[in-house]
Amino acid sequence: MNVSNRKTVSAAAILLQALLLASCLLPVRPFDEQRWWAQVESADPALLYAPHREDGRYFNPWMPMEKGFRDFLRWQLSERTLYAPEEEKELLDVLLDLSDRIRSTPGDFIAWIGHSSFLIRIDGAYWITDPIFSERALLPKRKTPPGLSLDVFAALPGKKNVLISHSHYDHLDSESIRRLPADTRIYVPLGLKALMNGLGKQDVVEMDWWQTVSCGDRCQVVCLPAQHWSRRITQNTNTTLWASFLLVSSDRKIYYGGDSGYFIGYREIGRRYPGIDYALLPVNAYHPRWFMYYAHMDAREALDAFRDLEARYFIPTQWGTFRLGDEPVGQAPSALSKAAQFSDTDPARIIVMGIGQLLPLGSRDPK
């Protein structure tokens, strides 16, 4: 990290500590789940295809975001959602020797590196989603180490491919991108190519929602909508796009949801791209609901998205590494288990991976 970045992080850390010292000044704001559900249901699906950039800024035309920095400050100055001590202490074990298991596993697989970073091998090609190997995502510090080192990933044979969903620091880590092999091909939403070039990566494919590009023989990448937003210290709010992706090969389809709130787009994606095998969907940073509801999904909404996509299996992402909301980093499995019972979801279709776990995809039924 260079000197200017260290100063920026230090200033941000001081501000955050001041906010934390002043916390608990405001009560928890109530949230009307039924009203939110009605708002989602009333959105016009045609707007998923509408223009989504105006005056240099991107937006979600089916439901523009209303939350802003003032709401963030209120969250920081509010009472925190309370959890049991055992929930607060629950952390994931990291499985060792992933590199050895990669070498000994034939065929396709999905391996979890941590947070939203997954290593995927399809038809001999390697893909990684939103790689972050750094100790911090700007401010939040890792609770668990990565299940694979960046050096091991770089040493894997063949060309590497990366999917970047948006510009937030827990999904776009500059140091990790900079250290990738120079010939890594990187797929990004609109507006992020210049940043990738500045980090030393020239093989960059910039994509808009609903755009499909070839990634080789019998391989396609589809850029799809998500309900989120973007900002970095060096970039203004929403000057770059956010997205989810569908990776299509001759044998299977893998959907990577990036970061998103629940929205009508999941139904349209499931309708347009039937037969999704694995849906990698985020379950993190959902408390407090009054602040997080628009851009993040809780366990129930993640299962609703899984149902809308009509995918065969659901793999939860974006948990277990960084504490970004009020909820503990290890809460996702228990929250999903409860939500699955409530929604009558077959638990066999939910694959909760461990950090460093490798899931072979040779069989149509990974169980």
Please name every model-derived segment.
Residues 25-43, 52-56, 161, 185, ...:
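Cap/insert and terminal regions of metallo-dependent hydrolase folds
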Residues 49, 141-188, 203, 274-280:
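Active-site metal-binding motif and surrounding structural segment of the metallo-beta-lactamase
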Residues 132-150, 229-236, 287-296, 323:
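Acidic/histidine-rich helix-loop elements
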Residues 117-121, 215-277, 293, 297-301:
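Catalytic core of the metallo-beta-lactamase
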